Swiss-Prot record:
Description of how the protein assembles with itself and partners: Monomer.
Site (Interaction with substrate tRNA): 105, 127
Binding positions for ATP per the UniProt entry: 14-21
Gene Ontology terms for molecular function: ATP binding; tRNA dimethylallyltransferase activity
Stretch list, region Interaction with substrate tRNA: 39-42
Residues annotated as binding substrate: 16-21
Protein name: tRNA dimethylallyltransferase 1
Coiled-coil ranges per UniProt: none
Matches recorded under Pfam families: IPPT
EC number: 2.5.1.75
Length: 309
């Protein structure tokens, strides 16, 4: 006997400046959907320019959720996001709309789809050893090993998804508790949603050029004024949100510690590095379908229509 069908959600992911927001709005219009933000910085009020929030036109065209829900001095963890996003998704589905989750914060997306488990001490060393064994033995052998200690979890994992295989083995060996049991006890099913993940593929040089243009545009449209207003409102440079890319460098400039030229170069460099880290994270997930946008929009739309049918 099978259980109830899992709710279906579409995920749009990829590095910063790849065009996720624009694609999500186009898809929402075509699919009668609503958008759930999964960018950890766009959560914060008053941080609009430096986080490249959707434009007024984009937000007016399609309902958006989880934008501007916390002040910059309020931490908003992956667990907080998972809870808030789940509520938003439930509301979207009740209204007969299709949920489209868009963002580049990989940990937020992982928390939403699979829940979070705190890493016990010693996890890093064990993870490295398991990764070495996977290189020697192959993914299938590691999946079979997981099946022996956590068969429920193993049935939900594709052999190519080495990240989840190793995570399951890691938790079991360090705690003696199958990850599937932990997830169940803490309110997370092995799978919470049926998801289709579309990643926007951009050639590296083109991505870096987009980043350069975006940073120039942010500075030209008032990033420094935005940061100054936040500081004057009492949100100090020591806050985690104010240490994020664009804001940290702007705080240093406003304090007289760097020139405008140096500030611009630093924001561009740090954004490129962040994009590389995002790609490393998302490339480790074999379930993501990578397609170019806007070139492959018709193909993306076909995938989405088939998924929701």
């Amino acid at each position: 006997m099978t259980g109830p069908a899992l709710p279906r959600i579409l995920i749009i992911c990829g590095p910063t400046a790849s065009g996720k927001s624009e694609l999500a709005v186009r898809l929402a219009r075509e699919l009668d959907g609503e958008i759930v933000n999964a960018d950890s910085m766009q959560i914060h009020r008053g941080m609009d320019i430096g986080t490249a929030k959707p434009t007024v036109g984009e937000m007016g065209a399609v309902p958006h959720h989880l934008l501007d829900v916390a002040d910059p001095d309020r931490p908003f963890s992956a667990a907080d996001f998972s809870d808030a996003a789940s509520q938003a998704i439930s509301g979207i589905i009740r209204r007969g709309k299709r949920p489209i989750v868009v963002g580049g914060t990989g940990l937020y997306l992982r928390a939403l789809l699979h829940g979070l488990v705190d890493s016990p001490s010693g996890a890093g060393e064990l993870r490295r050893r398991l990764q070495e064994e996977a290189r020697e033995l192959g993914n299938q052998a590691m999946l079979e090993r997981l099946r022996r200690v956590d068969p429920q979890l193993a049935t939900t994992i594709h052999p190519n998804n080495l990240v989840r295989i190793i995570r399951g083995l890691e938790v079991y060996h360090l705690t003696g508790i199958p990850l599937s049991r932990y997830q169940h006890e803490h309110g997370f099913a092995a799978e919470r949603y049926r998801s289709l993940a579309i990643g926007i593929r951009v050639e590296r040089r083109e991505l870096y050029e987009r980043i350069e243009r975006r940073v120039d545009r942010m500075l030209a449209t008032g990033l420094l004024d935005e940061v100054r207003a936040l500081l004057e409102a009492g949100f100090g440079p020591e806050l985690k949100a104010m240490r994020s890319i664009g804001y940290r460098e702007s705080c240093d400039f406003l304090a007289g510690n760097s020139s405008l030229e140096e500030t611009t170069a630093l924001i561009k460099r740090n954004t490129r590095r962040y994009a590389k880290r995002q790609l490393t994270w998302f490339n480790a997930d074999p379930e993501i379908i990578w397609l170019e946008y806007p070139e492959k929009f018709a193909t993306i739309l076909r995938h989405c229509i088939a998924f929701f049918e």
